[in-house]
Amino acid sequence: MYKSFYFYLFLVFSINISAEPMDHMDHMDHMKNHSAKMHGPIGLMGDHFHRKGESMISIRYMKMYMNHNYLGTNKLMDLNILELPNPTGMPKNLSVVPQDMDMDMVMLGGMYAPSDYITLMGMIMLEQKSMDLRSYKPMMSRDIVGDFSTNSSGLSSISMSLLFKILNREGSRLHAQLGLENSSGKNNLKDNVLTPMGTINEVILPYGMQLADKSYTLLSALTYSKTYDIWKFGSQIKSRINVKNDQWNFGDSYETNFWVQRDLNQITAWSLR
């Protein structure tokens, strides 16, 4: 079972710093390459590279609200879930049902280019998770026992990557990313739950509510973008492959993204991904 994504909110703040003096032509080129659309949509990481001596710091905020339970592609009501067997033993059937979940993520990032061909990128991820659940009696009428919430917050992960410029001419930019992420937050957080018997117990939260899995993940990506005046089109393929884990891990992932952006002014752009 999993939750369907219902609402997203993205905010980003970044500062670009050039460490080298520039003449007039360099300054014009610098301004052209640092319009708002040169930064991809907030959900993309490592979407651009920098010139030698440039650096950037950024703060990204993302909020996700999720509701509804699914088994595969089939939406389940609470009564459907109460009929499913309990994989942990007693009671015989599932009796605690998630209702909705909020996730708040803050990403603190930094980039620095020691050369025109390599950009260093670091990221610290902080997360806060909150889930509302409902407990039902374990037998007979399966009446509602009550509602409760569980929460977790703190450091999630730290990552370091290298971005390698492959192409940068006539509005076309192509680069590769290779990095390593350490899921260094806590993976055994506990909280109080309302049991089907009506008691309050402190238990280890399920993996979806944990902040980290104590694993190391190899990050790799290939990103291409093309700029036409005030328009920009881009695509990115990305993989996250676990290379070392503790007792469990979140699993590997593979992503493909396509986006289009348009400048509104020097500091603002809209995007569709």
Segments (PLM) and residue ranges:
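N-terminal signal peptide c-region/cleavage motif recognized by signal peptidases
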Residues: 14-16
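Transmembrane beta-barrel domains of Gram-negative outer membranes and organellar outer membranes
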Residues: 20-173, 179-182, 202-212, 216-220, ...
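Aromatic-anchored, glycine/proline-accented short structural segments
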Residues: 213-272
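Sec-dependent signal peptide recognition
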Residues: 2-10
